[in-house]
Amino acid sequence: MPTINQLVRKPRKSKVEKSDSPALNKGYNSFKKTQTNVNSPQKRGVCTRVGTMTPKKPNSALRKYARVRLSNLIEVTAYIPGIGHNLQEHSVVLLRGGRVKDLPGVRYHIVRGALDTAGVNDRKQSRSKYGTKRPKA
Protein backbone atom coordinates (compact mmCIF):
# COMPACT_ATOMS: atom_id res chain seq x y z
CA MET A 1 0.00 0.00 0.00
CA PRO A 2 1.46 3.37 -1.00
CA THR A 3 1.29 6.33 1.33
CA ILE A 4 -0.77 9.43 0.50
CA ASN A 5 2.47 11.32 -0.09
CA GLN A 6 3.67 8.73 -2.62
CA LEU A 7 0.36 8.96 -4.49
CA VAL A 8 0.54 12.77 -4.50
CA ARG A 9 4.04 12.65 -5.96
CA LYS A 10 3.30 9.94 -8.51
CA PRO A 11 -0.40 9.18 -9.12
CA ARG A 12 -1.70 5.85 -10.39
CA LYS A 13 -1.71 5.36 -14.15
CA SER A 14 -4.92 4.26 -15.84
CA LYS A 15 -4.70 1.18 -18.06
CA VAL A 16 -4.52 1.75 -21.81
CA GLU A 17 -7.15 -0.38 -23.54
CA LYS A 18 -5.76 -2.38 -26.46
CA SER A 19 -7.89 -3.38 -29.45
CA ASP A 20 -8.52 -7.07 -30.17
CA SER A 21 -8.51 -6.38 -33.93
CA PRO A 22 -6.09 -3.49 -34.58
CA ALA A 23 -6.13 -3.73 -38.38
CA LEU A 24 -9.81 -2.71 -38.43
CA ASN A 25 -8.96 0.53 -36.60
CA LYS A 26 -6.69 1.86 -39.35
CA GLY A 27 -7.48 3.51 -42.67
CA TYR A 28 -5.22 4.57 -45.52
CA ASN A 29 -5.00 7.95 -47.25
CA SER A 30 -3.72 7.13 -50.73
CA PHE A 31 -3.09 10.79 -51.59
CA LYS A 32 -0.81 11.42 -48.62
CA LYS A 33 0.27 7.74 -48.43
CA THR A 34 -0.31 7.74 -44.67
CA GLN A 35 -2.23 5.65 -42.15
CA THR A 36 -5.28 7.24 -40.53
CA ASN A 37 -7.32 6.29 -37.47
CA VAL A 38 -10.70 5.08 -38.73
CA ASN A 39 -12.74 2.48 -36.84
CA SER A 40 -14.56 0.01 -39.13
CA PRO A 41 -16.71 -3.02 -38.31
CA GLN A 42 -15.43 -4.87 -41.41
CA LYS A 43 -12.76 -4.38 -44.05
CA ARG A 44 -12.30 -5.56 -47.62
CA GLY A 45 -9.12 -7.33 -48.66
CA VAL A 46 -7.46 -9.52 -51.27
CA CYS A 47 -6.24 -13.05 -50.48
CA THR A 48 -2.50 -13.42 -50.97
CA ARG A 49 -2.32 -17.00 -49.72
CA VAL A 50 -4.84 -19.70 -48.80
CA GLY A 51 -3.87 -22.76 -46.80
CA THR A 52 -4.32 -24.95 -43.74
CA MET A 53 -2.68 -24.89 -40.34
CA THR A 54 -2.78 -27.14 -37.30
CA PRO A 55 -4.23 -25.88 -33.99
CA LYS A 56 -2.54 -25.74 -30.60
CA LYS A 57 -2.62 -28.67 -28.20
CA PRO A 58 -4.83 -30.48 -27.24
CA ASN A 59 -6.79 -30.00 -30.50
CA SER A 60 -6.08 -31.69 -33.80
CA ALA A 61 -7.40 -30.61 -37.21
CA LEU A 62 -6.49 -28.83 -40.43
CA ARG A 63 -7.99 -25.35 -40.02
CA LYS A 64 -8.44 -23.34 -43.21
CA TYR A 65 -6.96 -19.84 -43.26
CA ALA A 66 -6.20 -17.04 -45.71
CA ARG A 67 -3.52 -14.39 -45.64
CA VAL A 68 -5.28 -11.16 -46.64
CA ARG A 69 -3.96 -7.76 -47.73
CA LEU A 70 -6.55 -5.24 -46.53
CA SER A 71 -7.63 -2.02 -48.22
CA ASN A 72 -5.45 -0.16 -45.70
CA LEU A 73 -2.38 -2.15 -46.92
CA ILE A 74 -2.06 -4.15 -43.68
CA GLU A 75 -1.60 -7.90 -44.17
CA VAL A 76 -3.38 -10.19 -41.68
CA THR A 77 -4.24 -13.86 -41.22
CA ALA A 78 -7.97 -14.68 -41.26
CA TYR A 79 -9.92 -17.85 -40.53
CA ILE A 80 -12.30 -19.32 -43.12
CA PRO A 81 -15.31 -20.72 -41.20
CA GLY A 82 -17.61 -23.53 -42.35
CA ILE A 83 -17.14 -26.74 -44.32
CA GLY A 84 -15.55 -26.21 -47.75
CA HIS A 85 -14.74 -22.90 -49.43
CA ASN A 86 -14.09 -21.45 -52.89
CA LEU A 87 -11.29 -19.02 -51.99
CA GLN A 88 -8.00 -18.83 -53.84
CA GLU A 89 -5.28 -16.26 -54.40
CA HIS A 90 -6.65 -12.85 -55.57
CA SER A 91 -10.15 -13.55 -54.19
CA VAL A 92 -11.73 -10.39 -52.73
CA VAL A 93 -13.06 -11.05 -49.22
CA LEU A 94 -14.78 -9.20 -46.38
CA LEU A 95 -13.14 -9.45 -42.95
CA ARG A 96 -14.63 -9.07 -39.49
CA GLY A 97 -12.97 -9.19 -36.09
CA GLY A 98 -12.96 -12.25 -33.86
CA ARG A 99 -10.07 -14.49 -33.00
CA VAL A 100 -9.74 -18.26 -33.24
CA LYS A 101 -8.71 -19.52 -29.83
CA ASP A 102 -6.62 -22.50 -30.94
CA LEU A 103 -4.84 -20.78 -33.87
CA PRO A 104 -2.09 -18.41 -32.68
CA GLY A 105 -1.99 -15.11 -34.57
CA VAL A 106 -5.43 -15.48 -36.20
CA ARG A 107 -7.52 -12.49 -35.03
CA TYR A 108 -9.99 -12.14 -37.90
CA HIS A 109 -12.79 -14.10 -39.58
CA ILE A 110 -13.78 -14.04 -43.24
CA VAL A 111 -17.49 -13.26 -43.77
CA ARG A 112 -19.13 -16.08 -45.76
CA GLY A 113 -21.56 -15.09 -48.52
CA ALA A 114 -20.00 -11.64 -49.07
CA LEU A 115 -17.98 -10.49 -52.13
CA ASP A 116 -16.11 -13.46 -53.68
CA THR A 117 -16.75 -15.82 -50.76
CA ALA A 118 -19.59 -18.28 -51.35
CA GLY A 119 -21.88 -19.45 -48.56
CA VAL A 120 -21.69 -22.95 -47.11
CA ASN A 121 -23.60 -25.54 -49.17
CA ASP A 122 -26.47 -27.60 -47.70
CA ARG A 123 -26.50 -25.71 -44.41
CA LYS A 124 -29.84 -25.89 -42.57
CA GLN A 125 -29.13 -24.28 -39.18
CA SER A 126 -27.26 -21.05 -38.30
CA ARG A 127 -27.47 -20.12 -42.00
CA SER A 128 -26.97 -16.38 -41.49
CA LYS A 129 -23.55 -16.97 -39.93
CA TYR A 130 -22.43 -18.91 -42.99
CA GLY A 131 -24.05 -16.90 -45.80
CA THR A 132 -26.45 -19.64 -46.91
CA LYS A 133 -29.75 -18.76 -48.59
CA ARG A 134 -33.03 -20.24 -47.32
CA PRO A 135 -33.71 -23.61 -48.97
CA LYS A 136 -36.79 -23.91 -51.19
CA ALA A 137 -39.56 -25.83 -49.42
UniProtKB/Swiss-Prot annotation:
Q: Which CDD domains match?
A: Ribosomal_S12
Q: What would you give as a GO molecular function for this chain, any one?
A: rRNA binding
Signal peptide positions (record): none
Here the segments flagged for biased composition (Polar residues) are 27-42
Instruction: Tell me the residues on which 3-methylthioaspartic acid occurs.
Output: 102
Q: Which GO terms describe its cellular component?
A: small ribosomal subunit
Does the keyword rRNA-binding feature in the UniProt annotation? yes
Stretches for region Disordered: 1-55
Which terms under GO biological process does the entry name?
Answer: translation
Q: Does the keyword Phosphoprotein apply?
A: no
Instruction: State the family it belongs to.
Output: Belongs to the universal ribosomal protein uS12 family.
Please explain the role this protein plays, according to its UniProt record: With S4 and S5 plays an important role in translational accuracy.
Its quaternary organisation is:
Part of the 30S ribosomal subunit. Contacts proteins S8 and S17. May interact with IF1 in the 30S initiation complex.
Q: What protein name is recorded for this chain?
A: Small ribosomal subunit protein uS12
- Organism, by scientific name, is Enterococcus faecalis (strain ATCC 700802 / V583)
